[in-house]
């Protein structure tokens, strides 16, 4: 199935973020949510939904998100995405394109991916950031249905994240390039420095083009202090070369990583 979700934002006359254009091809759907207490006071809260039982063999999913100048969007998902079992030679793919205009802000934290036995899933995420824009983007993936004794029973998982800043001359300058490639039949993914005995991995990328390295360093230190209180999680926080930081987490419960990323998101929104 070829499925597509496309949405863009605009600023209302009262200075609040609204949906400008919205198109969804099943099983995708987006609903807007009431405004809750949030550091992004004029932002829009929305939920990405799906009527499908999961990602199936041959599925091609495309997501396009475009934020207008001065708008802010917090986008979550409804539930876990399950990548279902596939026949040998089959696969599914998702491509996400995100464009952040000048002074726009996006928080995007999909629920975890669960890789079922014999599944193959490839995803690519491309993000372009305008001047002084801000991004909080998370990914969480489970190595299988652990309670069903499925650990690394999938065939392949790959995730490529590329983030660029748009320069005055129209050219794109790379800020982040991150790649996860898991091939259980060819890799020892339980080895030291890999997944070891953990069953879930999470990555959270934060970029704020309005902040300098000294300000980012303060945020890294604050998050490191906060993460010291977390139990049963292996957490690493690194400052990027410029404008941001990355959090990498290993754990045994998806909900624990999800709540941690939501907590970090609230903190980053407020500074």
Swiss-Prot record:
<comment type="function">
    <text>Required for maturation of urease via the functional incorporation of the urease nickel metallocenter.</text>
</comment>
<keyword id="KW-0143">Chaperone</keyword>
<comment type="subunit">
    <text>UreD, UreF and UreG form a complex that acts as a GTP-hydrolysis-dependent molecular chaperone, activating the urease apoprotein by helping to assemble the nickel containing metallocenter of UreC. The UreE protein probably delivers the nickel.</text>
</comment>
<keyword id="KW-0963">Cytoplasm</keyword>
<dbReference type="GO" id="GO:0016151">
    <property type="term" value="F:nickel cation binding"/>
</dbReference>
<dbReference type="InterPro" id="IPR002669">
    <property type="entry name" value="UreD"/>
</dbReference>
<protein>
    <recommendedName>
        <fullName>Urease accessory protein UreD</fullName>
    </recommendedName>
</protein>
<dbReference type="Pfam" id="PF01774">
    <property type="entry name" value="UreD"/>
</dbReference>
<comment type="similarity">
    <text>Belongs to the UreD family.</text>
</comment>
<dbReference type="GO" id="GO:0005737">
    <property type="term" value="C:cytoplasm"/>
</dbReference>
<keyword id="KW-0996">Nickel insertion</keyword>
